[in-house]
């Protein structure tokens, strides 16, 4: 079994835990591989399949008498099948469709493996710590790669691997929120150091979306945590800290150069004069969203076909490799209203179950992932995540939080095939 405690990663070996240890190593390797070798073909596919194979070893080791199929696996399989079938009415048949399909199959493998691994609350706690550890390694790798003189220039997160800094910063935000949960709900004071480190990384990444989430996440978590003593004092304290973070970003020269000026330009773009000279990326993202809306209007029910947003933009507007920067409009333009309803149906189910666990059963873990899911929906107005691997790992962990609180584990969350008993 792999554990991360007091800043030390430990591997405890025993005959009973061999399969579990193999899976936990595969989980960490997969996260690091997707970051460090983002541009290497098929390596992400390999590590995703290894996660599934390792979870199968774990399932066999449990000597389970029933075949269990997680609901979130059925959901994403249905969404993947519908996405693939969109080739029948697609505006263009292109290589991107095959690439998207392969990526989505790997996502199915990864999210299924997580549902197999997480069988009780202790498993969920452990996988959260493994995720935090993985992001810590990624952050340290990036800091070690970038000279100190370059830190304030933004884009922290893209230097080591060439990955999109927005995407990396989003994943680090997830780890920051998990670390804040360990600090605030479980009283593990050392985790506040990780919260601070992750927040600094996000500031230096120049990602406005991740910065918003990294500040709003702890605030929302405290607001929802009505079970805590000194509730109103905690609200005042977290809002004060959030205000100080924003003040620091807007007044410190290095922080302002890294992200403060981008925040200022965004506010100018939203609330003042759009003709004023601001960050050109804001204009382009608004333009791409408008194009996605036009495509949806042309084919509202079925969409233009998986991967066709970029292809149509390339053929019609000669803009290569673009996306809408909005998960809602990306899905609506490519897969129509049917694809949109299939995809977000699981979000709805997860949020409802987490809300029930958080407010009725008083589960702090459910409160954590309810906060994450709410912010994910908000952030997807500026991110495209429906076929991204790492965000779906966190969504799968959030789904796992909906069933581990039950005394009998998966009784209510799984479809059971009893044919093996016959």
Predicted features by range, described:
Residues 1-63, 79-91, 376-378, 393:
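N-terminal signal-anchor transmembrane segment
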Residues 12-21, 59-74, 182-193, 226-235, ...:
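Membrane-interface helix-loop-helix junctions at transmembrane boundaries of multi-pass membrane enzymes
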Residues 28, 52-55, 368-380, 385-422:
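Transmembrane alpha-helices of multi-pass inner-membrane enzymes
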Residues 61-64, 126-129, 189, 314, ...:
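Hydrophobic transmembrane alpha-helices and their immediate junctions
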Residues 72-84, 93-116, 126, 130-135, ...:
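Aromatic-anchored transmembrane helix interface
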Residues 125-151, 163-227, 374:
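Alpha-helical transmembrane segments of multi-pass inner-membrane proteins
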Residues 151-161, 274-335:
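Long extracytoplasmic/lumenal interhelical loops at the membrane interface
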Residues 204-205, 225-274, 293-298:
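A membrane-periplasm/extracellular boundary helix in multi-pass inner-membrane enzymes
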């Amino acid at each position: 079994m792999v554990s991360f405690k007091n800043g030390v990663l430990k591997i405890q070996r025993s005959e009973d835990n061999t399969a579990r240890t193999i899976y936990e190593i595969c989980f960490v390797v997969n996260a690091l591989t997707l970051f460090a070798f983002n541009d290497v073909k098929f390596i992400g596919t390999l590590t995703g399949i290894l996660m599934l194979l390792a979870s199968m070893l774990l399932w066999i080791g449990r000597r389970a008498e029933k075949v269990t199929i997680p609901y979130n696996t059925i959901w994403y399989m249905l969404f993947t099948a519908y996405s693939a079938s969109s080739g029948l009415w697609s505006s263009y048949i292109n290589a991107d469709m095959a690439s998207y399909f392969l990526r989505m199959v790997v996502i199915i493998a990864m999210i299924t493996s997580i549902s197999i691994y997480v069988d009780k609350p202790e498993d969920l706690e452990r996988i959260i710590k493994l995720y935090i550890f993985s992001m810590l390694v990624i952050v340290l790798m990036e800091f070690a790669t970038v000279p100190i003189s370059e830190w304030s220039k933004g884009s922290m997160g893209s230097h080591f691997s060439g990955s999109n800094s927005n995407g990396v910063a989003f994943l680090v935000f997830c780890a920051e929120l998990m670390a804040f949960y360990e600090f605030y709900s479980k009283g593990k004071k050392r985790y506040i150091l990780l919260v601070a480190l992750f927040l600094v990384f996000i500031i230096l990444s120049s990602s406005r979306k991740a910065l918003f989430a990294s500040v709003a996440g702890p605030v929302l978590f405290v607001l929802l945590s009505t079970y805590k003593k000194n509730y109103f004092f905690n609200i005042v304290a977290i809002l004060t800290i959030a205000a100080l973070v924003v003040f620091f970003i807007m007044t410190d020269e290095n922080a302002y150069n890294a992200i403060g000026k981008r925040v200022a330009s965004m506010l100018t773009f939203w609330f003042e004069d759009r003709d004023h000279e601001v960050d050109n990326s804001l204009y382009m993202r608004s333009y791409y969203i408008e194009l996605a809306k036009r495509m949806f209007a042309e084919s509202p029910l079925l969409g233009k076909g998986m991967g066709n947003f970029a292809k149509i933009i390339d053929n019609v507007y000669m803009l290569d490799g673009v996306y809408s920067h909005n998960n809602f409009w990306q899905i609506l333009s490519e897969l129509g209203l049917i694809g949109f309803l299939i995809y977000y149906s699981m979000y709805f189910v997860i949020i409802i179950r987490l809300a029930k666990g958080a407010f009725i059963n008083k589960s702090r873990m459910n409160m954590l992932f309810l906060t994450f899911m709410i912010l994910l929906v908000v952030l997807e107005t500026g991110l495209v995540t429906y076929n991204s691997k790492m965000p779906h790992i966190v969504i799968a962990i959030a789904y796992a939080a909906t069933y581990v609180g039950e005394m009998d584990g998966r009784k209510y969350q799984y479809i059971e095939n009893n044919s093996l008993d016959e």
